[in-house]
């Protein structure tokens, strides 16, 4: 039986232009629990990645941008010398949607390559 993360990685983000409610705490909890290192921060999910140097941080940032472009769901990124902070939330609903967790799982999977 696949894990929640494996299921999320297989999914594709659905267009969201509003008109739906953000996920409830009960819906968020199992997905957040399945994602390693992600934290809820109000209406966002957030994770900070650390790398050996700036080159690795920048390469990871480019890979995150590739994932977000393919999914048409874009994070807020804060890039430091050897860190990248990634924040996902669904702007159209001012909260969390399944798209945020799909992208978080896909971003995490970049490090498994």
Curated annotation (Swiss-Prot):
One of its GO terms (biological process) is tetrahydrobiopterin biosynthetic process. SUPFAM superfamilies: PCD-like. CDD domains: PCD_DCoH_subfamily_a. One of its GO terms (molecular function) is 4-alpha-hydroxytetrahydrobiopterin dehydratase activity. It catalyses: (4aS,6R)-4a-hydroxy-L-erythro-5,6,7,8-tetrahydrobiopterin = (6R)-L-erythro-6,7-dihydrobiopterin + H2O. It comes from the Bacteria. Belongs to the pterin-4-alpha-carbinolamine dehydratase family. This is Putative pterin-4-alpha-carbinolamine dehydratase. It comes from Thiobacillus denitrificans (strain ATCC 25259 / T1).
């Amino acid at each position: 039986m696949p894990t929640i993360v494996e299921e999320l990685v297989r999914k594709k983000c659905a267009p969201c232009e509003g008109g739906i409610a953000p996920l409830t705490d009960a819906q968020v909890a199992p997905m957040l629990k399945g994602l390693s290192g992600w934290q809820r921060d109000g209406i966002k999910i957030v994770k900070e990645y650390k790398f050996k140097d700036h080159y690795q941080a920048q390469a990871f940032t480019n890979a995150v941008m590739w994932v977000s472009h393919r999914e048409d769901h874009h994070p807020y990124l804060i890039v430091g010398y050897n860190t990248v902070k990634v924040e996902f939330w669904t702007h159209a609903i001012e909260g969390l949607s399944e798209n945020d967790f799909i992208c978080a799982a896909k971003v995490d999977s970049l490090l498994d390559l």
